[in-house]
Regions:
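Zinc-dependent deaminase catalytic domain
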Residues: 1-172
Length: 172
């Protein structure tokens, strides 16, 4: 017998579903400045996951502390980045390679717009679409190269991702 009550459950879209999984994957990250996760999919199936973390067998930020690198931007502003870890996008590609899983034609779900180095790896891995939950302060070049290479880029939320200590004060 059918119920006549209206349904209140709203089923997430595939993009929302895989983004929620990417956010959960990010809870495994080992750097508190970028607890990001990433999921690679094709045909609505997960191929690989990755999160921000130190290389296997190497101490993490959570254990050892951050390894900072200061970046001076074209406008003269400075930001600091932790370079102890491997990005979630790099790890999703590495994990797929270790499992002999091709990412050709895949969609990537990421916490924020990938950095320029990750964008180039994404293109070379054959990934055809990137879906980011938030924007990245230095993501403009990534978006440009995605467009040039024919990689579709979708931003789910226009919010800019920030983290504590991102801007460097003068004299530091």
């Amino acid at each position: 017998m059918r119920s006549e009550e209206p349904k209140t459950h709203v089923r997430p879209s595939w993009d929302e579903y895989f983004m929620q999984i990417a956010e959960m994957v990010g809870t495994r990250a080992t750097c508190d400045r970028g607890r990001s996760g990433c999921v690679a999919t094709r045909d609505k199936r997960i191929l690989s996951t990755g999160y921000v973390g130190s290389p296997s067998g190497v101490k993490s930020c959570d254990e050892e502390g951050h390894e900072f690198h200061v970046v001076i931007h074209d406008d003269g502003s400075k930001t600091q980045h932790c370079i102890r870890t491997t990005h979630a996008e790099q790890n999703v590609i590495a994990q797929a390679a270790r499992a002999s899983a091709s990412l050709e034609g895949a969609t990537l779900y990421v916490h924020m717009t990938p950095c320029y180095a990750c964008a180039k790896m994404i293109i070379n891995a054959g990934i055809v679409r990137v879906v980011a939950n938030k924007d990245y302060h230095a993501g403009a070049r990534s978006k440009e190269i995605f467009k040039e290479a024919g990689v579709l880029f979708d931003l789910m939320n226009s919010e800019l991702e920030t983290y504590p200590g991102q801007a460097v004060e003068e004299g530091v």
